Design a protein with these regions (language model features):
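Extracellular/periplasmic helix-loop-helix junctions in multi-pass membrane proteins
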Residues: 86-95, 114-120, 140-142
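Transmembrane helix-loop-helix
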Residues: 23-33, 79-106
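Interhelical loop and helix-boundary elements at the membrane-water interface
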Residues: 1-10, 33-36, 40-75, 104-130
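Multi-pass membrane catalytic core of lipid/isoprenoid biosynthesis enzymes
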Residues: 1-26, 69-83, 125-131, 135-142
Length: 142
């Protein structure tokens, strides 16, 4: 079951994401979706790297994998390099979202002492939202 907080997050995150997509020229939408997906992967990998699992589930299983440097290279490095190569105009957005991910990670670890799969998934959606929002702002500033 989903609580009121989950429903609130759904409407806020997806409301902002859809608003950002409808605010840009139509020819930019596919690129923004691809960029936000790459940022989503980067965001989740920052939050999940060297995870201290809370509770049981897949998060505990994957925490063993996330403690390896190969995890960071494949889940952070590859999307990061692709983002820089495909979307050099969004470099400020990319670094801004990485800073937001680091801040969120520190906050989550302070509050919960670790993360589980639900928290990682929600953080990915938050990262996607910030990527779309900041990309939209950068389009109008350029």
């Amino acid at each position: 079951s989903v609580g009121a907080g989950g429903l609130f997050m759904f409407f806020v995150v997806y409301g902002i994401s859809v608003s950002a997509l409808f605010s840009v020229p139509k020819n930019k939408i596919p690129y923004m979706i691809l960029f936000s997906q790459l940022v989503d992967i980067i965001f989740m990998s920052v939050v999940f790297f060297r995870n201290k699992p809370i509770g049981e589930g897949y998060g505990k299983f994957f925490s063993v994998i996330s403690s390896r440097w190969t995890f960071l290279i494949t889940s952070f490095g590859i999307p990061f390099i692709l983002s820089l190569l495909l979307f050099p105009e969004y470099i400020v957005v990319l670094f801004s979202v990485i800073i937001i991910a680091i801040i969120l990670r520190l906050y989550l670890y302070k509050i919960f002492g670790g993360v589980n799969g639900d928290i990682v998934g929600a953080s990915g959606e938050i990262g996607r939202m910030f990527a779309l929002l900041l990309s939209t702002i950068s389009i109008f500033l350029v």
